[in-house]
Amino acid sequence: GGLGIRYQAEEPPLPHDYATAIRDKLADRGLEILIEPGRAIAGNAGILVTRVEYLKQQPEKRFAVVDAAMNDLLRPTLYNAWQNIVPVQPRDDADMHRYDVVGPVCESGDWLGRDRDLAILPGDLLAVRSAGAYGFTMSSNYNSRPRVAEIMVDGDTTHLVRARETLTDLWRGEQVLPA
């Protein structure tokens, strides 16, 4: 539910237009209407930055294996959602190829994007766009992977909002059974 956001060519309604349409239909019923805005508030405000670990060529497909995984951004796997993926620094010294952008957790569902035309090399940073809504709240520690840091960017200033988890964070609260 809630208002959607633009991932590709979608045209979700503007909040004002959406509210007006609902009010016009339901105003005479005397109802209290509560609306969950969904991704409209934060969806396009967040980007997941990931590094290309290596490029893998199979007979029928190319893979860009990155250091982020489905546990960091579940929407592509869970909803077959499209997230625009672009190089942080475009380059002209790499050939353009079509890649599936996949994570390192060795699951068939561990992908962030399929069939993406990218000119990339190992070590490049990729921006997975529109990752602001529910990215962290849907993330997990699957395969004992610490969750990513969250950084707020305000103009030229950055602020650490949430530190990257450590393995110690993952073990916190666990107890060893008595001998």
Region locations from a protein language model:
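Conserved N-terminal phosphate-binding loop of PLP-dependent enzymes in the Aspartate aminotransferase
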Residues: 13-14
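Alpha-helix-loop-beta-strand connector modules within alpha/beta enzyme cores
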Residues: 18-30
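A generic structural signal for short coil/turn motifs at secondary-structure boundaries
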Residues: 5-10, 137
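Glycine-rich beta-strand-to-loop/alpha-helix junction loops that act as flexible
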Residues: 1-6, 37-39
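Charged (often Lys/Glu-rich) extended helix/loop segments that serve as interaction or gating elements
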Residues: 30-179
